[in-house]
């Protein structure tokens, strides 16, 4: 009887210890770090859409790091998320990236390019506009005041001796959401629009006419239209995560360039998954004829955008110290 009781006690102890050990293992297996990545559901953020769709970043970082993707609709909201620490790495336009660098006193830096070019100047069908000079007295739409396309337009106007009406000139610049431009043109409320892809291809498919192609907008189309930024604090605390992110970003870039047909399908499927809508095959294919997918930052274009931002009053000072971290 005593032996049986002893066996029972020992067995109970073993089960308890084993259970405790299993609970401990469960705790150790939990992900101990998190990386928060911001992006737009837009084809100019191609690598983000590829990595999110295929889960390549999650797989490469392993079981100890969880990846959280957060979609934004505008640069300022993403910048605020960077400042608050809600995101660590982000795909964003070069102009808000510059603004974030200045406002954060250098804590937000550019760590890679993502895409280049990808914007066109189109006009309402039949409008008497054949060059930038013809925008005199016209209404031109841009997606958002102070964004990349707006700065490109301001540079084009200045190069042709024109100014927006807000600066005593004759060109009315109107901020119109990309999705609303087609209807606005159709109503005759605007004469022209400088828009990013895929909206350029979409407008051209709906009877708008080309005024300037992507390589006539700024820097022969080699300017950065989307870059990758990161918080320096996160980079210093998690260099291995940032390094792995950049490797996967590079791999996604290579995949898009080497296998465009299948990559565009992946990107389009991800857009549909996220927004409920996909692009027509002809639209996304035409759009990518005007978009360069690259990791190499064009420093001249970034500096140019910084100069325009300062001269137009969108930033109070030029970036001091490190803006592009290689």
What do these predicted regions represent?
Residues 236-312:
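Secondary-structure end/capping motifs
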Residues 11-19:
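Hydrophobic helical h-region of N-terminal Sec-dependent signal peptides
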Residues 95-96, 167-170, 174, 179-268:
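Pocket-lining segment of extracytoplasmic ligand-binding domains
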Residues 2-11:
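Bacterial N-terminal signal peptides that target proteins for export
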Residues 306-326:
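C-terminal solvent-exposed extensions
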Residues 21-24:
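C-terminal motif of bacterial Sec signal peptides marking the signal peptidase cleavage site
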Residues 31-165, 170-175, 191-197, 211:
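Short, glycine-/small- and polar/acidic-enriched structural segments
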Residues 26-28:
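Bacterial signal peptide processing site
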